[in-house]
Amino acid sequence: MNKETLAERLNASAGRQKADTVIKNGKIMDVFNQEWISADIAITGGVIVGLGEYEGEEVIDAEGQMIVPGFIDGHVHIESSMVTPIEFAKAVLPHGVTTVITDPHEIANVSGAKGISFMIEQAKKAPLNIRFMLPSCVPAASFERSGAVLKAEDLKPFYQEKEVLGLAEVMDYVSVAEGEEDMLQKLLDAKRHGKRIDGHLAGLSSDIINIYRTAMVSNDHEVTTKEEALDRIRRGMYVMLREGSVAKNTLNVLPAVNEKNARRFFFCTDDKHVDDLLSEGSVNHQVKMAIKAGLDPFLAYQLASLNAAECYGLETKGAVAPGFDADLLFISDVREAVVTKTMVAGRTVAENGRTVYEQSAGSYSPDQALLDTVRLKAPLTESDFHIPIQEGKKMNVIEMIPNHLETRKKEVPAPSADAFCPDTENDLLKIAVAERHSGEKMIGLGIVQGFGLKEGAIATTISHDSHNIIAVGTNDADLAKAINRLRDTGGGLTAVKNGELLHSVPLPIAGLLSDKSAEWVNDSLGVLHEKLPLLGFTGDFNPFLTLSFLALPVIPDIKMTAAGLFDVKAFQHIPLQ
């Protein structure tokens, strides 16, 4: 801001000149005193310059509606929506989300620094405030087969970007606890630039939390219980209440929030598909859930705005007050969080459930390296899914938990055979992870329980965090067909039955993102999910998103990688038997 800009704002604030915009007849939520106030809102240069009586070049009549600060999603992977940042903005702005803190580690695991650059350049063209945390663990663990490796030196140039707020979720707790050199450098670089550091403490003990706090990690979004939340709060952390397409922890963690500690909590979605964003919303959905569960509405809206802003040092976000950015929501029903108008920097960007802005031309095109990321040299065959077993020895099985990222390690007696065949009666299916980045043929095979498929197979190139191809199926032929379809199309999601392709959603950008509109992807996902009953699927969870997390070897108890079964607590690969 220069001297002329400041003078203009001061003149408008003092009433010496008209404000650019004045909002009248609204009830303003004061998130500091937790009360409603009646006043005009004066806006100049996208910033609130006063609450009181003002005149403006433009006057907006709020018609008695409530005006609250724009919602902030404190931790989200935009790639999980399967659309670009420009399309993601179109999905969340009508729901009142005006700022997101995003970690592009999904695309970074596939395409490295080029993937991060693509996301930042795309974000600059969206009216949504998109701020970035730099991926700290690419790959998620040293043994993982990702498409890139990012060292501290690779991240340093990105700290010059004003959109970058810090270092994203530090999930390799072994590297932190043992003081691994490159991890120490990443942590120090973030603090030397005056940035924040995000945590990822899934299932970790209080002793590890002590280590993370000593490493200057300020928050955690992997909390699933009241007890975990309070333990982190007493050690000085912020805690996020998460509600995504798979991980749904808001109601379990909410009992930890009280009037004394509420300022240390805020909302996030983490991973949410675009169809869920369009139909259900984002942080607005969590506000509604929290109020319905008994949280005071003032606290719910504070969690949705001010608290996240304070955690990340966003001094001009999170409140309707002078000096704050005019990121405002018009709310017709506070308890239901019904957003009728969304303003970003004083500009109306969405009304009555639809965006109302013209997207600037010349969207940033991805590098060719982002469009050629499924590198299986040859099609897979049925023999690639052969799992030899020994009769009489128990098999280690992944037991998935619907709507949770965690799994259970289960031992199941081996059948009387020399090779495992899927057992749909007992819901024991084959799971495969095929490395797709190097061209080397490497396929991890295992057994999973909990999907409930009776026929066919599903597969996707979205498999956190290395994003190799992951598939689950009832027979080898359909597993091969599903994976080969992704090889041919450059990535996406697919469903196969009896050798027939039921439907496929192409994701050509890094095998993670569509080059189509949010609406197009939503419609295509709808067709895909309509086909799932043909496979016998009747679950109340998203099987593709659930499948995508079964390859993440930093969330307990047992996961599947391209190198085979991985015991997260022991932090080592284990045999099937």
From Swiss-Prot:
EC number from the UniProt entry: 3.5.4.2
Cofactors named for this entry: Mn(2+)
InterPro entries named in the record: Adenine_deam, Adenine_deam_C, Amidohydro-rel, Metal-dep_hydrolase_composite, Metal_Hydrolase
Single Gene Ontology MF annotation: adenine deaminase activity
UniProt keywords, alphabetically: Hydrolase, Manganese
Top EC class of this enzyme: hydrolase
GO biological process, any: adenine catabolic process
Lineage top rank: taxon: Bacteria
Catalytic activities: adenine + H2O + H(+) = hypoxanthine + NH4(+)
Alphabetical list of Pfam families matching this protein: Adenine_deam_C, Amidohydro_1
SUPFAM superfamilies assigned to the protein according to its UniProt record, in alphabetical order: Composite domain of metallo-dependent hydrolases (SSF51338), Metallo-dependent hydrolases (SSF51556)
PANTHER family: ADENINE DEAMINASE (PTHR11113:SF2), N-ACETYLGLUCOSAMINE-6-PHOSPHATE DEACETYLASE (PTHR11113)
HAMAP family, per the entry: Adenine_deamin
Family indicated by similarity: Belongs to the metallo-dependent hydrolases superfamily. Adenine deaminase family.
Record's protein name: Adenine deaminase
The species this protein was found in: Bacillus velezensis (strain DSM 23117 / BGSC 10A6 / LMG 26770 / FZB42) (Bacillus amyloliquefaciens subsp. plantarum)
